[in-house]
């Protein structure tokens, strides 16, 4: 699978482009095109290695792999385990309120069974079974998590949380859920009661480096956090993306409980707004299959890039990108009859359980995820939150002294302070980093 290694993907793209230039001559411009994992690759390559791709056409967008793994990991272990195992059983409506999903099957049948990219057993068929890692039978075997596959980026360390004691160092992991109050906004909107909120967070637990459930919350490696942000493995709105033309065509799948949730497009847009003050180089189009804008968007991207190339002014590159955008490129959606509705794409953070503001949101309402319901930002890129003391003012429902004491025992070090950037979180301003063996522009 390549382990979602976007650095390898960037190098591969660069080599293909080089081969094309040697065979046919220099390309006029290079346009990224693809969905889901292909969207991740485009955004990560354009952000961390600007110039390989001149413009990008992502579909079924995820901003990057690592922040997307927050949703898959938390559904797969803490939430799915608790929500399915509770007695008496919980209704699907209650489960959806805790996760923010359009339907419980988003977690149960779509996110939950996804390939375990952060676990050691996500190996391609080319690696023989007897060569693969097992904590008891083959502790020195090949580990296939994204972080083990990117050891030259994330580095390694000894982990003593696995039994028996490992005989090899493992790739550093930035995944974390310390201080996360699952279901907080569901509690504050009256969708769950205090007893369930406390029970959920008391029993959610976390996972170890082998992605096995444990009672303790998952704790990120501090160096892995720093590396994830500084190197652009978590996509920010800065770096190369600040000057990249982006047309995001979103095939709406929320209604069929597909993990390609439409809110990820709004996540990417919000990162651009946060880091650049705007997202004017980003166009969001929403529609339902079988309608497709692929041919039209390719032609519009070509027109956009030609106009940028013809701009001989001394303006900053970001201003040229915005100024050259074709007039026909606007946020829009298309109804079942193929009629275009032009209006700004809006995600109302205050209406995550009923995001139907505007005609396009009425047709294609974006939903959320468990971290959003836990109070996290729409940028959805806080891997590990800063902590703060428990504050009764954060809860719309008054807590009794017994409930407060119980909450303090669940979160002895405090709860997430979502008003602050994540631990180690910085914009990605260093591009074209390398990871050895060449010393040129090597990340340290």
Residues covered by each model-derived region:
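C-terminal His-loop and adjacent cap/lid subdomain of alpha/beta-hydrolase
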Residues: 1-444
